[in-house]
Amino acid sequence: MRPYNPHPLFPVIECLRGAVVAIVVLLLVQTFLVEGLLTPHVVSSCSMSPALRGPHVALRCPECQTAFCIETGHLPQTSPDDLPLSWATCPACAFAQVPVFRDSFHKGDRIFIHRAIPSLRPIRRWETILFRTPDDGKLTVKRVVGLPGETLEIRDGDIYIDGKITAKPFAVQNEMRIPVPYGRWEMQMAEESGLYELAYYPIRNVPHTKPLFEMNDDSNESNIHSEELPRHVLYGVTNQLCENQWRGQDADNIFPVDDLMLTFDWRPENTMPLSLRLADVATEKPIELDFNPGDYTLRVSIDVNTFQSDLPRLATDNPHRIVVSLFDRQLTVAVDDSIIFEQPLDVKIAIPFALCLPGNKMLSQLEQETAIKRQIENLRVWRDVYYTQKPDGFPNASSFFSVTIPKDCYFLLGDNSCFSVDSRSWQNTFVTQCDMIGLISL
């Protein structure tokens, strides 16, 4: 048998063959995956703020260090001598001299579109999609709230389907929730229990242009300008969004929001329980939540009814994330992202939220406050999206919005309801399946 002698150019040929195969594979991946199934897209408007932002300015208040965003639509593009383009108002402390510079500008959020999903399965409620608008065919992003064949109503900011309120799943609540940057947590005594509790009130500052505090030249202490303190108002939580502060929202489209969420980190000490009180407007009896790590139970009292759920074992050396949601007339309690209690509510809840440690009754106010602050961290209040009857600039309905959705059509809304042009205002109200481009990957 003669020995095999490869051609001298065989290694070069093999390298070229491998390169050609690699190029073909890359082209196929780009064509069928990146360009076909996962298409990049840049959000171009504020209609889905704050979940998805269009062009915006990212700012930080020099007074309270709160980070916030505003849209860029009404900003001048240039200013002389490196001066600020404009001044913004902090949504937390109402300081009205937050400078806006050109280098704070950001493009819209970059998202990916799953183009194959609309052809593989039906679109689900609360999903966000890219589609062509029925009036002019423009590409835009909205959220699906109404499905084919349903009768949809908008009442008091909520979505009703076939006469029943539609509760968002917990994951959707976390995706859609909007931070409430204003408000104060204050210590007060509960008359019924004699305990001091930490209560939240949506107190706002009147917009002001001078700092509340000024550092002394000779020390690290600060002086407060008492003669120039802004007045505070207890205004309540509303559907106003700081991104829209330069648009001048119609007064008729400003509404109080009762669908709130409280989140905090709890580091329990031994078996000491934690209580959360919510005010019930109708019965004037508080809804009480008692977290008891000693016997691993959560007890919930609503009017004359008492419910009990299992509480997971909570390590005392680690903080645990607690979420209490009142979205869509439903009480949801989660610990470390796991739901432990859900119950529909027939009552209206009013602020304040109030936290206390029942085992501290013999302690002074200062000692109780210290114990609460030692165990409770990162207190934050959120609100749900409030859907208005119509966007600003359109006549509002007198009672509620109602529509029946045809077959193979969908009803879509933007999260920034006051300034979203969507199914409420399009001449051709509904979006068909064939107009949908793909599902948004947030």
Briefly describe each language-model feature range.
Residues 1-442:
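Extended hydrophobic leader/signal-anchor segments used for secretion and membrane insertion
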